[in-house]
């Protein structure tokens, strides 16, 4: 009787609510009551800030951000991506997608190796930097273009990269440079000339 009681404590509930998006299924088992017993009330400060930044920095004119298909299969990987962390339940996580011309082995940004499927692939990761690391590897070694998105706990999807449809290392006639200074560092003003002025040598 005691062993049956212990087994019931570690048996997951079978009546988890179904969702149309696969990333919601992993979060559906965490009800608000369970979160109260382990962590304090969620503070979606970063999510609110990201939503505000999204409204300000919209996609360039003439570029339509691609839509994320949640039914895209994931690569074949026998290990673990380290989990989506607790922040995926109260803030966000990231999804990277790409299309492979054939089934081939690639290195995971979290360690280990996986097999990408022929055609579309979708991989969920905890951090944006992991998506950038994997995307750089895909473009440099496999010559594969990629896209990644931010997914909020409420199911909202935000397209992140490449923002205007062109990768940063490529020339884009419509892209505005930020912090550009068309001179060598040797042509900067002497630091003593800008001392106590509140300016930097690269500002002049």
Swiss-Prot record:
The keyword Thylakoid applies. It is found in: Plastid, Chloroplast thylakoid membrane. One of its GO terms (biological process) is photosynthesis. Residues 1-48 form a transit peptide. Gene3D superfamilies: Photosystem I PsaD, reaction center subunit II. Keywords: Chloroplast, Membrane, Photosynthesis, Photosystem I, Plastid, Thylakoid, Transit peptide. It comes from the Eukaryota. Pfam families: PsaD (PF02531). It is a peripheral membrane protein. GO terms for cellular component: chloroplast thylakoid membrane; photosystem I reaction center. Belongs to the PsaD family. PsaD can form complexes with ferredoxin and ferredoxin-oxidoreductase in photosystem I (PS I) reaction center. PSAD may encode the ferredoxin-docking protein. This is Photosystem I reaction center subunit II, chloroplastic. It comes from Nicotiana sylvestris (Wood tobacco). The gene is psaD.
């Amino acid at each position: 009787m005691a062993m049956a009681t212990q087994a019931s404590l570690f048996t997951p509930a079978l009546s988890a609510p179904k969702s149309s998006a696969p990333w919601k299924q992993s979060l559906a088992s965490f009800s608000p009551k369970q979160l109260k017993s382990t962590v304090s009330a969620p503070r979606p400060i970063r999510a609110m800030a990201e939503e505000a930044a999204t409204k300000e920095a919209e996609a360039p004119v003439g570029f339509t951000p691609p839509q994320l298909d949640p039914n895209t299969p994931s690569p074949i990987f026998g290990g673990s991506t380290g989990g989506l962390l607790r922040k995926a339940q109260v803030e966000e996580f990231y999804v990277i997608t790409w299309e492979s011309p054939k089934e081939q082995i690639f290195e995971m940004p979290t360690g280990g190796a996986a097999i990408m499927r022929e055609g579309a692939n979708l991989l969920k990761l905890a951090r944006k930097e992991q998506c950038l690391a994997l995307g750089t590897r895909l473009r440099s070694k496999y010559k594969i273009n990629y896209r990644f998105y931010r997914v909020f706990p409420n199911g909202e999807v935000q397209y992140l990269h490449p923002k205007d449809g062109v990768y940063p290392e490529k020339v884009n006639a419509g892209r505005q440079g930020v912090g550009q200074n068309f001179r060598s560092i040797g042509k900067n003003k002497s630091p003593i000339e800008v001392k106590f002025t509140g300016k930097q040598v690269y500002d002049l």
